[in-house]
């Protein structure tokens, strides 16, 4: 289930974001990123929780009145290749698509398009 980030999950969120290439375990950069999610109303961090375990993080930035950009997608290494990343991307698209055009940073663009391809294949299979 996708939940909004809360301050009491800061260490878990920082750990997940540290797997992003731009963050790469740079503690000061991670702290700045988390602070931005906590203080900037246009930055939204969501966590993926199953049972009592946070397994992933996805962060978006509202660029303007029409665009939201997915800028962070990270899954705990022990839960990778289980569909969590794809599920988070698709959930965020569902959350924001009625109000914004959803896109990504260059860093995660390929992953985003793979998620869309898998979703399209699933929809076609259901027809």
Question: Predicted segment positions?
Answer:
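A short helix-loop-beta-strand connector motif used in the catalytic cores of GNAT acetyltransferases and
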Residues: 35-47
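Conserved GNAT acetyl-CoA-binding A-motif
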Residues: 96-110, 117-122
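Structured beta->alpha junctions
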Residues: 5, 74-77
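Conserved beta-strand in the GNAT
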Residues: 47, 53-62, 69, 74
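Short, basic/aromatic recognition patches
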Residues: 29-35
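Conserved acetyl-CoA-binding loop-helix of GNAT-fold acetyltransferases
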Residues: 75, 81-94
């Amino acid at each position: 289930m996708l939940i909004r980030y809360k301050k009491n999950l800061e260490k878990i969120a920082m750990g997940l974001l540290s797997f992003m290439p731009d963050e790469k375990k740079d503690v000061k950069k991670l702290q700045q990123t988390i602070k931005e999610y906590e203080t900037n109303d246009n930055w939204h961090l969501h966590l993926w929780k199953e049972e009592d375990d946070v397994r992933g993080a996805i962060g978006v930035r509202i660029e303007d009145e029409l665009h939201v950009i997915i800028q962070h997608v990270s899954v705990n290494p022990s839960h990778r290749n289980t569909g969590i990343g794809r599920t988070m991307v698709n959930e965020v698209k569902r959350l924001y698509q009625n109000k914004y055009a959803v896109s990504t940073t260059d860093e995660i663009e390929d992953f985003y398009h793979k998620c869309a391809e898998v979703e399209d294949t699933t929809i076609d299979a259901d027809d």
